[in-house]
Amino acid sequence: MQNEKITQELIDIRNACGSRVVLDGKSHIAPIDDKAFFDKCLIYSESKNLHAKNTVAWRPMSDDWKERCRSNSFWFQNTVAEAKKMFPEMDERLFELKARLLDFAGDAVCLPGYEEDLDDILEYGQFWLGYNAERMRGEACQCHANSARIWEQNQDKSVICTGYALSADGMWRQHSWLIHRKPRSNKIVETTRPRVLYYGFALTPEMCERFADENF
């Protein structure tokens, strides 16, 4: 169990790393918790809102791909009971995460057998749009190491985030990225390929240090 200091640090960094939104006529940085909040607020500004929201789009999965996933993958099953027939050790909260992601966007969530950050993702997670992410190209399929390297070089203005990202093929996958902290807004820093949407939590400085030690 986390102590109160770490819990407050995670809450503070979560709020600080939110998105620029306009709600009730006021512009501020706030976490996008879910689709309901996303729908009722303006993203960035009134002039940018429609374009920003229209970027949350993806190619529907083909029937053949769905059938392969259904036959081979616990995470594609419709219920916890069905998933546990294929993977009895599954943490049932993974399906809570799956529902949270698919309620917002996408067709499927490629879940791991074990998600070591599940508690923090569920407790402190938020959504970010990916269409205007800064690109700092790293090694392919090495998002954790890439993010660790960039953070090591930019600790004063960046924060590592980890969780899941939605690709244009409609699949959410495990992913890590960074937030570039700016005076008036925050921007995703993507080190591999473009993503439609992100969901995860921002790490505290101590967590970033540990993440970098383990991944870079």
Predicted feature locations:
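Short, glycine-biased loop/turn motifs at secondary-structure junctions and
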Residues: 2-64, 69, 138, 210
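A structural boundary/capping signal
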Residues: 2, 59-216
